Amino acid sequence: MPLLNSVTTPYAEALLQVVNENSQTEEMVSEVKQLLELVNDSPELEKALSSPILETDAKKKIIIEIFSNKVNSSLLNFLKLLADRQRIGILTSILDRFLEIYRENSNIALATVTSAVELTDEQKGLITKKIINIAGTEKLELVTKIDPSLIGGFVASVGSKVIDASLASQIRKLGLTLSK
């Protein structure tokens, strides 16, 4: 991915600079997350934006039509710039990189917690506190996923660290111990 990062980083940093100059950081981070979710949930939109067949003006028209009421003007202008520069096809990578740089600059760790069932707010709070201690950070962004194959418990990952407290893992370990 280093090659893609060399393309995405300048755009992500430019967006972050605009955001910081306009004191819109929290608002923009929220909008970028919503935009990423929207694009990731719509394969047709992603295909259209990355299509080499569609002209730049057509892509800009799509951007304006879909996003003009959903994002602020700075982000809308950024999307149009990406279309002009033929970079709208890597939009999700640029936005992911933007969030990555934002987290690095703000000392926010990103943790992914996968559980067998939906976690309650209390459980999320307890897991967040535990991960903050392990990660050695003051702030944490928690992404939750559901995987019924875990049977119970959870698997948390932050950076290169993984905490596997799932029932499926414990059953696997027990099976290995009994087979010896």
Curated annotation (Swiss-Prot):
Domain of life per record: Bacteria
UniProt key word Nuclease: no
CC terms in the record's Gene Ontology section: plasma membrane-derived thylakoid membrane; proton-transporting ATP synthase complex
Pfam families found in the cross-reference section: OSCP (PF00213)
Annotated compartments: Cellular thylakoid membrane
Bilayer topology: Peripheral membrane protein
InterPro entries referenced in this protein's UniProt entry, alphabetically: ATP_synth_OSCP/delta_N_sf, ATPase_OSCP/dsu
Keywords from the named record: ATP synthesis, CF(1), Hydrogen ion transport, Ion transport, Membrane, Thylakoid, Transport
GO molecular function, one term: proton-transporting ATP synthase activity, rotational mechanism
Main location: membrane
Subunit description: F-type ATPases have 2 components, F(1) - the catalytic core - and F(0) - the membrane proton channel. F(1) has five subunits: alpha(3), beta(3), gamma(1), delta(1), epsilon(1). CF(0) has four main subunits: a(1), b(1), b'(1) and c(10-14). The alpha and beta chains form an alternating ring which encloses part of the gamma chain. F(1) is attached to F(0) by a central stalk formed by the gamma and epsilon chains, while a peripheral stalk is formed by the delta, b and b' chains.
Entries under NCBIfam families matching the protein: ATP_synt_delta (TIGR01145)
Family, similarity comment: Belongs to the ATPase delta chain family.
General function of this protein: F(1)F(0) ATP synthase produces ATP from ADP in the presence of a proton or sodium gradient. F-type ATPases consist of two structural domains, F(1) containing the extramembraneous catalytic core and F(0) containing the membrane proton channel, linked together by a central stalk and a peripheral stalk. During catalysis, ATP synthesis in the catalytic domain of F(1) is coupled via a rotary mechanism of the central stalk subunits to proton translocation.
Name of the protein in question: ATP synthase subunit delta
Native source species: Prochlorococcus marinus (strain AS9601)
Gene expressing this chain: atpH
